[in-house]
Amino acid sequence: MIQAEYGVVRSEKRTAAEIKVATECPINFNEEVKKIISVNAVAFITSAENKGEKTLVRAKVAFRAVYLTEDGFKKCEAFAEAEAELPIVGAIVCAEAVDVRMSSVNDGFAARCGVRFTGESFKTDENQVLTGGEGLIIKPCEVIADEVTETASEEFTVADEFEVNYAVKEVLCHSEFIRVKSVESGVSRAIFEGDAEITVKALPFSENNDIIKEKRAVPFRFELPVIGALPDMLALGEVRLCKEAVKVFTDEAKNKSSISVELTLAATGCGVNRIKTQAAIDAYSRTDEVMLTRNQPAIEIFEGTRYRDERITAKTNAAAPDGARILGTLGEAVTVFSVNSSDGKTTINGSVKADVIFRNADNGTTCVQAETPFSLDITEEGKVCNVKVALCDLTARVRGGDIEFEF
């Protein structure tokens, strides 16, 4: 008589979700506006909580506008809120402001954008497998699957202060890019290493209104407590920006300024354990008839996260005004249109755009919106998922009368 023995193979199925919502708020300028130069927006996640089989994500959106008055460039800021319910639980979530625009409303202005909420989580699938038994002769095989720990999240702070050799009249805008270089698993922790790349667009005390760009990279290392994580595991995680504070202290007598930046970041991650289970790929008996039900479960194996930098120089769709020179760029943004995978190659198509500010030959100011497409190829074995593209830096120049981007 056959007495079969069974085991269970647990595997993690990655699930992803994306929801885009709209938000807007009025922009109140304190003085007469000659021209709107640029508007952009940043979305900060304020909370993420499980609600049944969903994750409720809330975000604050900061709209930032640069405009021109009789006294030169000025800036203003306004805030809105957005929320969405992602149809997944325990998600690693992100929020991004897209399609930012300004429009006239009655006697004023309103800023609008879409907020794209994305998240990914893991759902455990269980499959029963034959492992042996009395009266059975089996052909063994090894089933490899992943098990993930619980997802953890915690905030930490990154700060920097630097001096510039000119007197700053005003910081027109600033942006922060969180570059994660590695996520490793340790004893009950996930270890994140990377840089917080800070870009400040400053307006000095001068008559030419040049916009000066300052860039700083602040390294960070953060150990996130993760229950069940061990050094022989892989780790999966993200770091996002939660809060930002930029302050300027100017000494006009010395013609110097000090710029301080404090960022609150949130690390979210988990450990990924590779489990090997012995199972039977075939079985028979010398004494009894054996009937097998064969099943090939779809098991995804996490091989790690890849990070890659790409430098592109491309002509845009815009021309430079005759006799004008570039003062700077504002409102830089990247948009991904499609991600397609085939035969081990993943192609990412998108575009980069920016507001290019010119000083005209008659000493006036012109803002030209320029955009250029891009295409990137990634070659990796296996399935590529959760592709993200960030714009780290952009320089505009005039070549042959056209605006060219290097990014």
Residue spans for each PLM region:
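Viral structural modules
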Residues: M1-F407
